[in-house]
A protein has these predicted regions:
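Bacterial N-terminal signal peptides
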Residues: 9-18
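Bacterial N-terminal signal peptides that target proteins for export
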Residues: 1-10
Length: 127
């Protein structure tokens, strides 16, 4: 009877450790997915090619735990595949939110100020 209790206790501990490892692994995969999407979005957002600021666009980039974008990204609408970029930005927001929830990430809930678009030296900039 005592050996059955020890075996059961060992099994429960192993199960709990395995579950924790799976959660950590899952969170790691969520973070990797978010990082990949962020890299892809940055690669898609081409700030060059516009001739005036009116051709530049701006969007939120990523997700803060309290909500809203963690930063903003600017690009030239003439040289950027806007539809693909917006889809990637939406996927990035969802991926970061899922990762943040999985790890219980908290934030100071500070507002990320929306920058103004600028056209400097032939490039769209968020300042």
């Amino acid at each position: 009877m005592a050996s059955q209790a020890i075996q059961l206790g060992t099994w429960v501990v192993a199960l709990l450790m395995g579950a924790g490892g799976a959660d950590g692994e899952s969170a790691s995969k969520l973070k990797q997915r978010a990082d990949t999407l962020a890299s892809e979005a940055r690669a898609l957002a081409n700030p060059s090619g516009c001739e005036k600021v009116e051709e530049c666009e701006l969007a939120g980039f990523g997700h803060k735990p309290c909500g809203g974008p963690r930063e903003y990204i600017a690009w030239c609408s003439r040289t950027t595949d806007v539809k693909t970029l917006r889809a990637r930005l939406e996927a990035l927001e969802k991926a970061e939110k899922a990762w943040q929830e999985a790890v219980g990430l908290k934030s100071n809930c500070g507002l990320t100020r929306k920058p103004r678009l600028r056209w400097e030296a032939g490039q769209c900039r968020a300042r």
